């Protein structure tokens, strides 16, 4: 990713950075509109997720997470920006004339060929079942349910590692540090998701954040007591508690929020590290 730094000609361009190489020119038959209503509200209009709202209108790109065009070679034609995710996407022209979007693998360039199937080479961008991959393979876009499509390791720079295969299951180490079991018949894509340096890009001003649909975040210590448990006091007062809490009074640090009786509890060998 080529980072272009703005010239400091105005305060709004100071410290700003954008990617100068990736543009957005989607195909009409692979996009459709979205009805964004609420922006963090429920059906009653009450805020259920804070710090969301506004933002520029978006068109959703249909991404092929299933990679079910088996044994048909495709060629990367474009690498495009997708406003619905922080990873880039690339347009694939398959040999049978079909065109699809997939997540852009790191290092893939225009003109590269990819393929999905059971007996395909272990090459960046190829999709195949876990049972056909050697141990230590770096993968992304991993299926949890066979045939449902990739659900794990899809963010920019995400990569998981195949560390073991035993019986009907394969053991994966996910980007979060979690180690879990997945069926060996599930498929994944070889390589790492592109746009690794997305966290190095500086938006430069508050308005750029608003375009993404993210509203300002206010600290609880500067609120009134009616709005937050940390609020109140004269001047720059401390929070008045031994440990910080959420706006609803729950512990803010270290509290586990995962359901204890979730179906995948027995499949997780080691919980994610912070």
Swiss-Prot record:
Keyword terms of this UniProt record: Chloroplast, Plastid, Ribonucleoprotein, Ribosomal protein
Organism: Arabis hirsuta
Cellular localization per UniProt: Plastid, Chloroplast
Annotated PANTHER family: LARGE RIBOSOMAL SUBUNIT PROTEIN UL2M, RIBOSOMAL PROTEIN L2
GO molecular function, a single term: rRNA binding
Subunit note: Part of the 50S ribosomal subunit.
Name this polypeptide is given: Large ribosomal subunit protein uL2cz/uL2cy
Family classification: Belongs to the universal ribosomal protein uL2 family.
Family matches, as InterPro entries: NA-bd_OB-fold, Rib_uL2_dom2, Ribosomal_uL2, Ribosomal_uL2_bac/org-type, Ribosomal_uL2_C, Ribosomal_uL2_CS, Ribosomal_uL2_dom3, Ribosomal_uL2_RNA-bd_dom
HAMAP family assigned to the protein according to its UniProt record, in alphabetical order: Ribosomal_uL2_B
Region spans: Disordered: 1-22, 225-274
GO biological process, one term: mitochondrial translation
CC annotations in GO: chloroplast; mitochondrial large ribosomal subunit
SUPFAM superfamilies documented for this protein: Nucleic acid-binding proteins, Translation proteins SH3-like domain
């Amino acid at each position: 990713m080529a980072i272009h730094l703005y010239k400091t000609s105005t305060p709004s361009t100071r410290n700003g950075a954008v990617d100068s190489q990736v543009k957005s020119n989607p195909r009409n038959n692979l996009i459709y509109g979205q009805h964004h209503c609420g922006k963090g509200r429920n059906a009653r209009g009450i805020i259920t997720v804070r710090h969301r709202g506004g933002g520029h209108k978006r068109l959703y790109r249909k991404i092929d997470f299933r990679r079910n065009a088996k044994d048909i070679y495709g060629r990367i034609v474009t690498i495009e920006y997708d406003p619905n995710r922080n990873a880039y996407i690339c347009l694939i022209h398959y040999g049978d004339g079909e065109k699809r979007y997939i997540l852009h693998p790191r290092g893939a360039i225009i003109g590269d060929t990819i393929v999905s199937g059971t007996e395909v080479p272990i090459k960046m961008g190829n999709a195949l079942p876990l049972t056909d991959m050697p141990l230590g393979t770096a993968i992304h876009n991993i299926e949890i349910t066979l045939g449902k499509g990739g659900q794990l390791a899809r963010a920019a720079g995400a990569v998981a590692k195949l560390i073991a295969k035993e019986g009907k299951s394969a053991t994966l180490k996910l980007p979060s540090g979690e180690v879990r079991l997945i069926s060996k018949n599930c498929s994944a894509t070889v390589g790492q998701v592109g746009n690794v340096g997305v966290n190095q890009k500086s938006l430069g001003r508050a308005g750029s954040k608003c375009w993404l649909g993210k509203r300002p975040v206010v600290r609880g210590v500067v609120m009134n007591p009616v709005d937050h448990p940390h609020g109140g006091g004269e001047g720059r007062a401390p929070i008045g508690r031994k440990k910080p809490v959420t706006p609803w009074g729950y512990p803010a640090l270290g509290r586990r929020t995962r359901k204890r009786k979730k179906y995948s509890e027995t499949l997780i060998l080691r919980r994610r590290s912070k």
